[in-house]
């Protein structure tokens, strides 16, 4: 029984994050449900509702007879305290059931830094994966550079790439397992035989077939027919759609989806260099829905992509360029400069140059060359446009934090009155540690959760003082 009242919710910020009831939410009759799935995103509702994999799985699983997927998100600090004070476990948005009531808990693993939130959500649900009475815990991984071994003590199953495997193989076999009353070990051995599915208690070092699975993933994934649309006015919820070359079918599917959901913000991902077809699709969508906002994720700015930028209005938003200090080539620098000038000439008001420094074999000569280039950009474009500079540290195993700090200081001194936002060194260090296979990671995650360290949004807003103190305690 839920111990949180409406009066309790009035005391927290954004209570609609926890109430559910959105347009497009799926509710099923209890008599129809054979397998319950807790679909978990280890960050705030605001972030998870814009995650492609989460929305895809929600639509896929709930379109299947006998399966019911309900959403769980990382609670903000205010309601986390409320849950603890009321002795209330984390609950789903749809039916307010606790995670222990589900057969499966699927966590969408998007960023290593969110490992901490995964552990926190399980703690708030009073779930220990060693307890046979709890749900089977699955990690859904899209990034093939992801190293699951640091989470082997938490997860029962990892799935790489092909999301349809969740239903076609894992849940289908579970239905057979339940009906025939087979042992859980027999079930897990069966699952481990599936390509790109890892059961760590059986074979954590199983080879992942990256290339074949990536190709199949694009073929298998179709546009989803139903998603919840957020009730929170401050959330500019967008619909993430995988682009494909069959633009007529894609157009028809998108139009149907807009009619069903009322969503007005589209974001295309996995876009190819077929700019002509992409532009045709965008023009037809805008003709049908003039107020539709369309963006293309990670679309590199160039002469070929210019018309898409101007037609969608993306030209007036941040135009991003990225550069790595290591082994910068003159041809690359000239191309970036020409692209920046082209963007400004066509109305760009905001340029964002993300600078990556800190590679293990990087030299100060690399940084010198980089700083000269940045100063040149500032001289050319500052009159016409706002240029935002940010530094991301490429912390690698073997790097010395003190050396990176010295490089940061060197870069600041070389840049003439240019304002930079620098990534926090402790955050960079944490991300690198979590990426590196290490038997001590579970202890670090547990310590971080107990220390009150949380990741509350996509900008990685966490208590860096607590993080620094944690490193000192663990002598890291």
Indicate where each model-derived feature is located.
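Radical SAM enzyme core and accessory elements
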Residues: 1-25, 39, 407-476
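N-terminal [4Fe-4S]-dependent radical SAM core
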Residues: 6-38, 45-46, 197-241
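Histidine-anchored nucleotide/phosphate-binding helix
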Residues: 23-28, 51-63
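Conserved SAM/AdoMet-binding glycine-rich loop
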Residues: 39-43, 250-352, 357-365, 369-372, ...
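Short connector loops at secondary-structure junctions
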Residues: 66-86, 142-145
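Flexible glycine/acidic-rich beta-alpha junction loops that bind and position SAM and/or redox cofactors
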Residues: 78, 147, 326-329, 357-366, ...
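Glycine-rich beta-alpha loop elements in corrinoid/cobalamin-binding modules
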Residues: 87-206, 398
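Terminal amphipathic helices with adjacent charged low-complexity linkers/tails
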Residues: 164-167, 171-174, 185-233, 272, ...
């Amino acid at each position: 029984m839920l111990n949180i009242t409406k009066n309790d919710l009035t005391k927290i910020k954004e209570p609609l994050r926890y109430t559910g009831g959105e347009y497009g939410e799926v509710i099923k009759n209890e008599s129809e449900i054979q397998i319950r799935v807790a679909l978990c995103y280890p960050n705030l509702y605001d972030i998870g509702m814009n995650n492609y994999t989460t929305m895809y799985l929600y639509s896929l699983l709930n379109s299947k007879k006998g399966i019911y997927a309900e959403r769980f998100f990382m609670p903000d600090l205010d309601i986390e305290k409320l849950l603890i004070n009321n002795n209330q476990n984390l609950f789903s948005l749809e039916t307010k059931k606790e995670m222990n009531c589900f057969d499966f808990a699927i966590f969408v693993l998007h960023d290593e830094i969110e490992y901490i939130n995964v552990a926190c959500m399980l703690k708030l649900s009073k779930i220990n994966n060693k307890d046979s009475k709890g749900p089977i815990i699955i990690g859904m991984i899209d990034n093939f550079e992801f190293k699951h071994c640091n989470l082997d003590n938490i997860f029962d199953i990892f799935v790489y790439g092909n999301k349809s495997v969740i239903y076609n193989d894992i849940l289908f076999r579970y239905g057979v397992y339940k009906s025939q009353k087979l042992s859980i070990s027999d079930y897990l051995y069966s699952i481990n035989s599936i390509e790109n599915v890892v059961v760590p208690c059986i074979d954590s070092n199983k080879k992942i077939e990256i290339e074949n699975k990536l190709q199949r993933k694009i073929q298998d994934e179709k546009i989803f027919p139903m998603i919840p649309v957020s009730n929170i006015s401050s959330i500019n919820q967008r619909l993430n759609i995988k682009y494909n070359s069959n633009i007529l079918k894609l157009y028809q599917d998108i139009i149907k989806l807009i009619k069903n959901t009322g969503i007005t913000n589209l974001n295309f991902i996995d876009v190819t260099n077929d700019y002509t077809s992409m532009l045709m699709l965008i023009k037809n969508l805008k003709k049908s829905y003039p107020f539709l906002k369309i963006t293309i994720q990670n679309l590199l700015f160039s002469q070929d992509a210019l018309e898409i930028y101007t037609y969608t209005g993306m030209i007036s938003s941040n135009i991003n360029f990225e550069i790595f200090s290591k082994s910068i080539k003159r041809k690359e620098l000239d191309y970036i400069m020409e692209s920046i000038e082209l963007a400004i000439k066509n109305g760009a008001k905001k340029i964002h140059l993300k600078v990556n420094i800190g590679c293990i074999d990087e030299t100060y000569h690399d940084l010198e060359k980089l700083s000269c280039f940045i100063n040149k950009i500032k001289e050319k474009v500052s009159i016409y446009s706002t240029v935002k500079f940010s530094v991301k540290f490429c912390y690698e195993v073997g790097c010395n934090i003190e050396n990176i700090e010295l490089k940061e200081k060197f870069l600041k001194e070389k840049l003439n009155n240019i304002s930079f936002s620098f990534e926090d060194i402790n955050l960079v260090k944490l991300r690198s540690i979590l990426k590196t296979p290490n038997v001590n990671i579970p202890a670090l995650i547990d310590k971080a959760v107990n220390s009150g360290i949380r990741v509350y949004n996509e900008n990685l807003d966490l208590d860096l003082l607590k993080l620094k103190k944690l490193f000192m305690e663990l002598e890291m």
